[in-house]
Protein backbone atom coordinates (compact mmCIF):
# COMPACT_ATOMS: atom_id res chain seq x y z
CA UNK A 1 0.00 0.00 0.00
CA UNK A 2 1.22 3.50 -0.87
CA UNK A 3 3.05 5.34 1.92
CA UNK A 4 0.69 8.31 1.67
CA UNK A 5 -2.24 5.99 2.36
CA UNK A 6 -0.38 4.51 5.33
CA UNK A 7 0.13 8.01 6.73
CA UNK A 8 -3.57 8.77 6.32
CA UNK A 9 -4.52 5.55 8.10
CA UNK A 10 -2.17 6.41 10.97
CA UNK A 11 -3.90 9.78 11.33
CA UNK A 12 -7.26 8.01 11.63
CA UNK A 13 -5.82 5.64 14.23
CA UNK A 14 -4.44 8.52 16.30
CA UNK A 15 -7.84 10.25 16.31
CA UNK A 16 -9.41 7.32 18.17
CA UNK A 17 -9.45 7.88 21.93
CA UNK A 18 -9.43 5.71 25.05
CA UNK A 19 -7.81 2.59 23.61
CA UNK A 20 -4.27 1.25 23.34
CA UNK A 21 -2.48 1.65 20.01
CA UNK A 22 -2.52 -2.02 18.98
CA UNK A 23 -6.28 -2.30 19.62
CA UNK A 24 -6.83 0.79 17.47
CA UNK A 25 -4.68 -0.63 14.67
CA UNK A 26 -6.64 -3.89 14.68
CA UNK A 27 -9.92 -1.99 14.68
CA UNK A 28 -9.00 0.22 11.73
CA UNK A 29 -7.75 -2.75 9.68
CA UNK A 30 -10.95 -4.60 10.57
CA UNK A 31 -13.00 -1.63 9.27
CA UNK A 32 -10.93 -1.26 6.09
CA UNK A 33 -11.30 -4.95 5.27
CA UNK A 34 -15.03 -4.81 5.96
CA UNK A 35 -15.49 -1.79 3.69
CA UNK A 36 -13.41 -3.31 0.88
CA UNK A 37 -15.30 -6.60 1.10
CA UNK A 38 -18.72 -4.96 1.11
CA UNK A 39 -17.86 -2.57 -1.71
CA UNK A 40 -16.85 -5.23 -4.21
CA UNK A 41 -19.26 -6.99 -6.55
CA UNK A 42 -16.98 -10.01 -7.02
CA UNK A 43 -18.72 -11.76 -4.15
CA UNK A 44 -22.29 -12.61 -5.26
CA UNK A 45 -23.12 -14.27 -1.95
CA UNK A 46 -21.40 -12.33 0.79
CA UNK A 47 -20.37 -13.93 4.04
CA UNK A 48 -20.92 -11.37 6.82
CA UNK A 49 -20.04 -13.97 9.47
CA UNK A 50 -16.35 -13.40 8.69
CA UNK A 51 -16.77 -10.05 10.43
CA UNK A 52 -19.32 -11.05 13.07
CA UNK A 53 -16.96 -13.80 14.19
CA UNK A 54 -14.33 -11.18 15.01
CA UNK A 55 -16.55 -8.44 16.41
CA UNK A 56 -14.27 -8.33 19.48
CA UNK A 57 -12.01 -6.04 17.41
CA UNK A 58 -14.91 -3.62 16.90
CA UNK A 59 -14.39 -0.56 19.12
CA UNK A 60 -17.68 0.93 17.83
CA UNK A 61 -16.24 4.36 17.18
CA UNK A 62 -18.75 6.06 14.84
CA UNK A 63 -16.33 8.81 13.86
CA UNK A 64 -13.67 6.27 12.88
CA UNK A 65 -16.24 4.24 10.95
CA UNK A 66 -17.22 7.33 8.98
CA UNK A 67 -13.58 8.25 8.32
CA UNK A 68 -12.77 4.72 7.08
CA UNK A 69 -15.87 4.67 4.88
CA UNK A 70 -14.74 7.94 3.29
CA UNK A 71 -11.12 6.75 3.07
CA UNK A 72 -11.96 3.50 1.26
CA UNK A 73 -14.45 5.26 -1.01
CA UNK A 74 -11.92 7.88 -2.10
CA UNK A 75 -9.04 5.40 -2.43
CA UNK A 76 -10.93 2.41 -3.80
CA UNK A 77 -9.09 2.72 -7.10
CA UNK A 78 -5.73 2.82 -5.31
CA UNK A 79 -6.32 -0.40 -3.38
CA UNK A 80 -6.42 -3.50 -5.57
CA UNK A 81 -8.35 -5.94 -3.43
CA UNK A 82 -7.21 -9.04 -5.34
CA UNK A 83 -3.59 -8.31 -4.37
CA UNK A 84 -4.18 -6.68 -0.97
CA UNK A 85 -2.47 -8.29 2.04
CA UNK A 86 -4.21 -7.13 5.25
CA UNK A 87 -1.30 -8.57 7.25
CA UNK A 88 1.14 -6.39 5.33
CA UNK A 89 -0.86 -3.31 6.32
CA UNK A 90 -0.88 -4.49 9.93
CA UNK A 91 2.88 -5.00 9.82
CA UNK A 92 3.48 -1.53 8.38
CA UNK A 93 1.45 0.11 11.17
CA UNK A 94 3.42 -1.48 14.02
CA UNK A 95 6.75 -0.25 15.31
CA UNK A 96 9.68 -2.60 15.86
CA UNK A 97 9.04 -2.47 19.60
CA UNK A 98 5.41 -3.51 19.18
CA UNK A 99 6.31 -6.35 16.82
CA UNK A 100 8.82 -7.63 19.36
CA UNK A 101 6.32 -7.41 22.23
CA UNK A 102 3.76 -9.35 20.18
CA UNK A 103 6.34 -11.91 19.06
CA UNK A 104 5.09 -11.56 15.48
CA UNK A 105 7.69 -11.67 12.73
CA UNK A 106 6.34 -12.12 9.21
CA UNK A 107 8.28 -13.92 6.51
CA UNK A 108 9.59 -11.99 3.47
CA UNK A 109 7.82 -12.98 0.25
CA UNK A 110 11.05 -13.94 -1.50
CA UNK A 111 11.79 -16.51 1.21
CA UNK A 112 8.26 -17.92 1.03
CA UNK A 113 8.57 -18.23 -2.76
CA UNK A 114 11.93 -19.97 -2.38
CA UNK A 115 10.48 -22.41 0.14
CA UNK A 116 7.51 -23.24 -2.08
CA UNK A 117 9.76 -23.85 -5.08
CA UNK A 118 11.99 -26.16 -3.03
CA UNK A 119 9.03 -28.11 -1.62
CA UNK A 120 7.17 -28.54 -4.89
CA UNK A 121 10.33 -29.59 -6.69
CA UNK A 122 10.10 -32.67 -4.45
CA UNK A 123 6.38 -33.09 -3.80
CA UNK A 124 3.99 -33.49 -6.71
CA UNK A 125 0.82 -31.43 -6.45
CA UNK A 126 -2.54 -33.11 -6.94
CA UNK A 127 -5.98 -32.76 -5.40
CA UNK A 128 -5.16 -35.09 -2.52
CA UNK A 129 -2.31 -32.97 -1.11
CA UNK A 130 -2.97 -31.53 2.35
CA UNK A 131 -0.80 -28.61 3.49
CA UNK A 132 -0.61 -27.13 7.00
CA UNK A 133 0.87 -23.91 8.31
CA UNK A 134 0.95 -24.61 12.08
CA UNK A 135 1.45 -20.95 13.05
CA UNK A 136 -0.23 -19.19 10.15
CA UNK A 137 0.06 -15.62 11.47
CA UNK A 138 -1.21 -13.17 8.87
CA UNK A 139 -1.76 -15.88 6.27
CA UNK A 140 1.20 -15.15 4.01
CA UNK A 141 2.10 -18.81 3.47
CA UNK A 142 -1.53 -19.85 2.92
CA UNK A 143 -2.12 -17.06 0.40
CA UNK A 144 1.12 -17.76 -1.48
CA UNK A 145 0.35 -21.49 -1.47
CA UNK A 146 -3.05 -20.78 -2.99
CA UNK A 147 -1.54 -18.52 -5.65
CA UNK A 148 1.19 -21.04 -6.50
CA UNK A 149 -1.12 -24.05 -6.75
CA UNK A 150 -3.89 -22.25 -8.66
CA UNK A 151 -1.43 -20.80 -11.18
CA UNK A 152 0.60 -23.97 -11.78
CA UNK A 153 -2.40 -26.32 -11.73
CA UNK A 154 -5.33 -24.51 -13.39
CA UNK A 155 -7.16 -27.84 -13.64
CA UNK A 156 -7.75 -27.69 -9.87
CA UNK A 157 -10.87 -25.78 -8.85
CA UNK A 158 -10.01 -22.63 -6.89
CA UNK A 159 -12.58 -23.27 -4.20
CA UNK A 160 -11.39 -26.85 -3.87
CA UNK A 161 -7.82 -25.65 -3.27
CA UNK A 162 -8.93 -23.19 -0.56
CA UNK A 163 -11.30 -25.58 1.18
CA UNK A 164 -9.58 -28.96 0.87
CA UNK A 165 -5.85 -28.46 0.47
CA UNK A 166 -4.94 -25.56 2.78
CA UNK A 167 -5.00 -25.69 6.59
CA UNK A 168 -3.86 -23.23 9.22
CA UNK A 169 -3.60 -22.93 12.99
CA UNK A 170 -2.76 -19.93 15.16
CA UNK A 171 -3.25 -18.95 18.79
CA UNK A 172 -4.17 -15.35 17.96
CA UNK A 173 -7.69 -14.25 16.97
CA UNK A 174 -6.51 -11.36 14.85
CA UNK A 175 -4.05 -13.54 12.95
CA UNK A 176 -6.90 -15.90 12.12
CA UNK A 177 -8.95 -12.96 10.84
CA UNK A 178 -6.05 -11.69 8.71
CA UNK A 179 -5.53 -15.16 7.22
CA UNK A 180 -9.19 -15.64 6.36
CA UNK A 181 -9.89 -12.21 4.89
CA UNK A 182 -6.58 -12.30 3.02
CA UNK A 183 -7.57 -15.58 1.37
CA UNK A 184 -10.99 -14.16 0.49
CA UNK A 185 -9.40 -11.17 -1.21
CA UNK A 186 -6.82 -13.19 -3.15
CA UNK A 187 -9.14 -16.02 -4.20
CA UNK A 188 -12.04 -13.73 -5.11
CA UNK A 189 -14.28 -16.37 -3.56
CA UNK A 190 -17.15 -15.79 -1.17
CA UNK A 191 -18.37 -17.96 1.67
CA UNK A 192 -15.23 -20.11 1.88
CA UNK A 193 -15.40 -23.07 4.27
CA UNK A 194 -12.06 -22.44 5.93
CA UNK A 195 -9.79 -24.97 7.58
CA UNK A 196 -8.13 -22.28 9.69
CA UNK A 197 -8.44 -22.87 13.41
CA UNK A 198 -7.66 -21.06 16.61
CA UNK A 199 -5.44 -23.14 18.85
CA UNK A 200 -1.95 -23.99 19.99
CA UNK A 201 -0.44 -26.49 17.57
CA UNK A 202 1.89 -27.80 20.27
CA UNK A 203 -0.57 -28.55 23.06
CA UNK A 204 -4.17 -28.41 21.78
CA UNK A 205 -5.89 -31.48 20.40
CA UNK A 206 -7.12 -30.27 17.01
CA UNK A 207 -8.36 -33.39 15.28
CA UNK A 208 -7.17 -33.39 11.68
CA UNK A 209 -5.84 -36.09 9.39
CA UNK A 210 -2.12 -36.17 8.73
CA UNK A 211 -0.49 -33.83 6.23
CA UNK A 212 1.65 -34.16 3.12
CA UNK A 213 3.38 -30.84 3.73
CA UNK A 214 3.89 -28.80 6.91
CA UNK A 215 5.38 -25.43 6.14
CA UNK A 216 5.77 -22.10 7.87
CA UNK A 217 7.61 -19.81 10.23
CA UNK A 218 7.25 -21.15 13.80
CA UNK A 219 7.36 -18.45 16.48
CA UNK A 220 10.73 -17.81 18.08
CA UNK A 221 9.93 -17.74 21.79
CA UNK A 222 13.01 -17.87 23.97
CA UNK A 223 13.20 -19.61 27.33
CA UNK A 224 12.81 -16.34 29.25
CA UNK A 225 9.65 -15.33 27.38
CA UNK A 226 7.61 -18.45 28.14
CA UNK A 227 5.54 -18.83 31.30
CA UNK A 228 6.55 -21.47 33.82
CA UNK A 229 3.27 -23.36 33.37
CA UNK A 230 3.63 -23.44 29.59
CA UNK A 231 7.22 -24.63 29.80
CA UNK A 232 6.14 -27.46 32.11
CA UNK A 233 3.65 -28.63 29.48
CA UNK A 234 6.31 -28.57 26.79
CA UNK A 235 8.86 -30.33 29.04
CA UNK A 236 6.34 -33.16 29.49
CA UNK A 237 5.29 -33.47 25.83
CA UNK A 238 8.59 -32.79 24.09
CA UNK A 239 11.28 -33.76 26.58
CA UNK A 240 13.58 -35.01 23.82
CA UNK A 241 13.93 -31.58 22.22
CA UNK A 242 12.71 -29.10 24.84
CA UNK A 243 14.74 -28.82 28.03
CA UNK A 244 16.76 -26.27 29.98
CA UNK A 245 16.94 -23.10 27.83
CA UNK A 246 15.56 -24.50 24.59
CA UNK A 247 13.42 -22.37 22.25
CA UNK A 248 9.73 -23.18 21.78
CA UNK A 249 10.14 -23.54 18.02
CA UNK A 250 12.16 -26.74 18.61
CA UNK A 251 8.88 -28.41 19.56
CA UNK A 252 7.39 -27.65 16.13
CA UNK A 253 9.77 -30.18 14.54
CA UNK A 254 8.67 -32.84 17.03
CA UNK A 255 4.94 -32.12 16.72
CA UNK A 256 5.30 -31.69 12.96
CA UNK A 257 6.72 -35.21 12.68
CA UNK A 258 3.69 -36.55 14.56
CA UNK A 259 1.25 -34.83 12.18
CA UNK A 260 3.13 -35.71 8.98
CA UNK A 261 2.39 -38.56 6.58
CA UNK A 262 5.15 -41.14 6.14
CA UNK A 263 6.38 -39.55 2.91
CA UNK A 264 5.58 -36.00 3.98
CA UNK A 265 7.77 -32.91 3.97
CA UNK A 266 8.49 -30.26 6.60
CA UNK A 267 9.85 -26.88 5.50
CA UNK A 268 10.45 -24.30 8.23
CA UNK A 269 12.17 -20.93 8.27
CA UNK A 270 13.74 -20.57 11.71
CA UNK A 271 16.53 -18.93 13.61
CA UNK A 272 19.84 -20.57 12.71
CA UNK A 273 21.17 -20.95 16.25
CA UNK A 274 19.64 -24.40 16.75
CA UNK A 275 22.42 -25.75 14.49
CA UNK A 276 25.05 -24.88 17.11
CA UNK A 277 23.32 -24.07 20.41
CA UNK A 278 24.13 -26.21 23.44
CA UNK A 279 20.47 -26.69 24.34
CA UNK A 280 19.57 -27.73 20.77
CA UNK A 281 21.58 -30.94 20.81
CA UNK A 282 18.38 -32.91 21.40
CA UNK A 283 16.70 -31.24 18.43
CA UNK A 284 19.67 -31.91 16.16
CA UNK A 285 19.59 -35.58 17.15
CA UNK A 286 15.82 -35.72 16.65
CA UNK A 287 16.07 -34.27 13.14
CA UNK A 288 18.92 -36.61 12.21
CA UNK A 289 17.07 -39.68 13.48
CA UNK A 290 13.59 -38.86 12.16
CA UNK A 291 14.06 -37.00 8.87
CA UNK A 292 15.93 -37.30 5.62
CA UNK A 293 17.45 -33.84 5.32
CA UNK A 294 17.06 -32.63 1.74
CA UNK A 295 18.45 -29.14 2.13
CA UNK A 296 19.42 -26.54 4.73
CA UNK A 297 19.72 -22.96 3.49
CA UNK A 298 21.59 -20.59 5.79
CA UNK A 299 20.65 -16.93 5.23
CA UNK A 300 23.36 -15.70 7.58
Question: What is the predicted role of each segment?
Answer:
Residues 2-164, 169-182, 200, 276-283:
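Class I S-adenosyl-L-methionine
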Residues 106, 110-111, 136, 143, ...:
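Signature of N6-adenine DNA methyltransferases within the class I
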Residues 123, 160, 188-189, 195, ...:
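A generic structural signal for short, solvent-exposed coil/turn residues
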Residues 126, 191-193, 263:
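Short secondary-structure junction motifs
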Residues 165, 193-195, 292-295:
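Conserved beta-strand segments of alpha/beta enzyme cores
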Amino acid sequence: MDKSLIREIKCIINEIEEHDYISKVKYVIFLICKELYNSKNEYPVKNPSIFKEYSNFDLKDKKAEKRIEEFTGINEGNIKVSSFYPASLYESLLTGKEKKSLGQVYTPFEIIDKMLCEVFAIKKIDGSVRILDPSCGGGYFLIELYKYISSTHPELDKRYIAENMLFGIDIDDFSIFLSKIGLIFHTGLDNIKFNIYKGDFLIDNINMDKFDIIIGNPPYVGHKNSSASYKRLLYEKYSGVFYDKADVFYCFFNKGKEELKTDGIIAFITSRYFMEALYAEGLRSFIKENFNIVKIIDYK
